[in-house]
Amino acid sequence: MKIKPKMISRFGVYSDPSQSRWLNLFNHVLSLPILFLSSRLANPSCHNLCTINTPPKHFRSLLGLGLKFCPTPSHTTSRAQIESSLSRFRTDFLTKVFFCDKRFDPHNTWTPGQLYLRSSDWSGPQLHAIPPEIHTRVSAFLSTIRPMFHKRRVRRNLTPIQERLLESFSNNPDFLVVPSDKNLGPVLLDRTTYVRRCLDDHLLHPTYERLTSTAANNFTSETTKLLQSFLQAHDQSISAGDTLYLHRYLASVTDPYAYFYALIKVHKSPWQTRPIVSVSGSTLYGLGKWLDRQLQPLIKTLPTYLPSSFTLKQELDKMGGTNFSRMSLFTGDIVAMYPSIQIHDAFEKIASYFTTLDTTIYPPNLINAILSALQLIMTRNCFRFGDTFWLQKDGTAMGTPPAPSFATLYYGIFELELLQSFGSHLHYLRHYIDDQFGIWIHDPDPQVDCQRWLDFKNRQSQFCSLNWVFSSLSSSVHFLDLTIHLEPYQISTSLYEKPLNLHLYIPWNSAHAPHIRKSVITSGIFRILRLITHRSEQQLHLAKFFTRLLARGYNHSFLYSTFQHALNRFATRTNACLPRTSVPELFWPNSPPLHTTDESAFFHLPYHPQDPPSRLLQSAFREHIFHPVSLQKKRIFARTCDPSSYYGAFYNGDEWVRAPPRIVQLRHVEPKLTDLRNLNGQHIPIDRLIVAYHRAPNLKNLLFPRHSEGKCPSATSVSSTLDLPQDDEATDIPSHN
């Protein structure tokens, strides 16, 4: 009797030797849940780059789900979990009610998107600061929500084999599951190969320097002191809200280090690695976010700045009617741009460029704060890799929030000079971080044209010793996610897809909220209709998209209805009956107007497919907070028909008898929440509840967590891979100014 559960636990199926294989297969299919049969994947695949160890059998059944797949938690949301959510809702809701009049304060300096961290000491307004009616409504809402949630065990969306593989791959000493560059699918790699390639390709280069643990701790402590000095020195240059955010963030830091990891470029032959430094939560992350907000408006003024492929498509459509007979397309790519940038030269170029700006927008004290923040962030990038500590000595500090803006600004300043020198040959020039796209105007003399094209490439390669790779001049190029074609009087575009893209969309049975599935489909359809010029190609890509979603377990009826809804929505927004319009308005549909007086209350909740749906929570909000209807008990006495009788009594023939009262319930409609006022006399503008789900950990969180190369105690450490003791032959750096 013990053999059957053991076989099911190990192999996921029990085969009775006394029965035929077809009967065993039939019984196995009957035992499967309907979810696994209706949403079975047709393309479970991944990139296997293992050369040392042999992966376990059926590993593609797990990794083929994609790293965005969320396994269903074994239990529904417990009472303890919902209590924390209810407590947060009470605090957030009462805080919104308390401060709802501040948005009309003329002295309020708050702006949308402003950096903000709530004080750790804030636990909501005091009890007497909120009207009693609001407390009553919130308590009624919480009392209704609380009984809806109770912990119970549920069936997971993984087979026994997949659960065993998930347990095996978590902190495995032999294998690592690594995301691929360009989102081409998960990569299974030998752990030692991954660590060795990270060291050989990046960390052992002169750009980086290894530190001892003592030196790294001293370095991060000194960085904290420098950041505090920065805040004191530039207190008058930074707004009060941003200063408050920076102080609160610095006080909340628990781990001062950033962490290094690499993505696998499987589309390269042989495969390569892309270095990434995750700085979220580190000492300088808050300052980096502030600096990026200062640089973003500046880079948007550069003539060669390109924010996205949608903007590129819009600008190319505006060129319709131009004679392109003497023009060609080209692209350029900088190899390892971030480490190649010479920091001191970049500081000089950017500081010189700041002197040309309007002082009313960028006053000198703000410019000094920006340059000081750049100096601090770009020269203090200290991070961990496994049990080792490293310092980036040169180049752009990878992973920091202002890194893309810094690199874009630095090269955009140089491109201003490039446009002056080669403007007669450049009909169009744009760049997106390290990628460049342009339209070249040919000279009538072929020899002159060839020399000018060569000078253009050499001029860029000589700037900052960047290693450029240019395409040849042609009528068709690949740039970002587009294939751009040069036609006689227009430029058409289509989608470009990497050949090794596995198209692992979120499977149907993933533990995501239902609206996520629809949003993935809708955004994919909108992307096809916005970026593709010709209608025949739109239909071809829509058909491919439909087929790929079927392979991920989606059913036909759901896809048909969602596709039709998305197409109708797109046609409505673009005021077109068919998705063939190529006018610029097609690519920037206007959103429906929002009522500026309406606000939402947010209910943060962990998502579980077996929990009560969001519509029940929103219904409870409407019934108990927004527009409650209460039932009040009232005593009603009998009334006789005798005109001489008095109310509440009747004559039984001998004497007058008082009638017993009858208890009834009467509906009492209370005023809407928007009709109530807080204690400052301001109307409360909250009219709806948004259930903000946060998903369960996905496969990427489980198989490739932060600092994954150092979390397996039985694996070979990074310092051992270096063939060095952990702190030997590492540099002891007391300080870096």
Where on the chain are the PLM-derived regions?
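Charged structural interfaces that engage phosphate-rich ligands
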Residues: 1-737
